[in-house]
């Protein structure tokens, strides 16, 4: 059986890793769609799709998950929910089950006839992309929330400096002091 998981992964954190490990106990292969692939260089979406592919590939390898068990596919957003499932199906191998905690994603795939399962969330208050990015901006401990290989990717691309620089830009655009 092949499953599908869609997420922005901004950045890929330990909660994502636990969800993937849990899903891989139920399916033979997992398609991991990196959502909003066209977005980057903003506080909400600081990393490019390519950088997120690096994060996932390295983290899954670091945790002993064979590459033969998953596909990582960046997927750009489309602005029409009625066509979104078809868009995903066009870009991915066939799949049998969809894993999502997002009510809209659940609804769209269930209306298209797919079995949809809400994956367990692991310490959602701590393991969320929003919390990781907040800690990066506030010089907090963000590293402990991520697999070591993801920390290395973020260091390699100067990700924290990028987010802090973007925060200055966005404040100045709002008329604040930069």
From Swiss-Prot:
Pfam families: CTP_transf_like. GO terms for molecular function: ATP binding; nicotinamide-nucleotide adenylyltransferase activity. Pathway: Cofactor biosynthesis; NAD(+) biosynthesis; NAD(+) from nicotinamide D-ribonucleotide: step 1/1. GO terms for cellular component: cytoplasm. Its EC number is 2.7.7.1. Its main location: cytoplasm. It is found in: Cytoplasm. It is an enzyme of class 2 (transferase). Keywords: ATP-binding, Cytoplasm, NAD, Nucleotide-binding, Nucleotidyltransferase, Pyridine nucleotide biosynthesis, Transferase. The keyword Cytoplasm applies. The keyword RNA-binding does not apply. It catalyses: beta-nicotinamide D-ribonucleotide + ATP + H(+) = diphosphate + NAD(+). InterPro entries: Cyt_trans-like (IPR004821), NMN_Atrans_arc (IPR006418), Rossmann-like_a/b/a_fold (IPR014729). Homohexamer. This is Nicotinamide-nucleotide adenylyltransferase. It comes from Methanothermobacter thermautotrophicus (strain ATCC 29096 / DSM 1053 / JCM 10044 / NBRC 100330 / Delta H) (Methanobacterium thermoautotrophicum).
């Amino acid at each position: 059986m092949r499953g599908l998981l869609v997420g922005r992964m901004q950045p890929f954190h330990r909660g994502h890793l636990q969800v993937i490990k849990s899903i891989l106990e139920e399916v033979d292969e997992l398609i991991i769609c990196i959502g909003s692939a066209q977005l980057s260089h903003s506080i909400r979406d600081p990393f490019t799709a390519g950088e997120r592919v690096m994060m996932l590939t390295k983290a899954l390898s670091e945790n002993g998950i064979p590459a033969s068990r998953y596909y990582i596919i960046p997927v750009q957003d489309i602005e029409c929910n009625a066509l979104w499932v078809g868009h995903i199906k066009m870009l991915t191998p066939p799949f049998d089950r969809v894993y999502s905690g997002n009510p809209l994603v659940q609804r769209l795939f269930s209306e298209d006839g797919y079995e949809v399962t809400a994956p367990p969330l692991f310490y959602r208050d701590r393991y969320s992309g929003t919390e990781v990015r907040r800690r990066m901006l506030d010089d907090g401990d963000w590293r402990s929330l991520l697999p070591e290989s993801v920390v290395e990717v973020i260091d390699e691309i100067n990700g924290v400096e990028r987010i802090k620089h973007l925060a200055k830009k966005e404040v100045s655009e709002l008329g604040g002091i930069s």
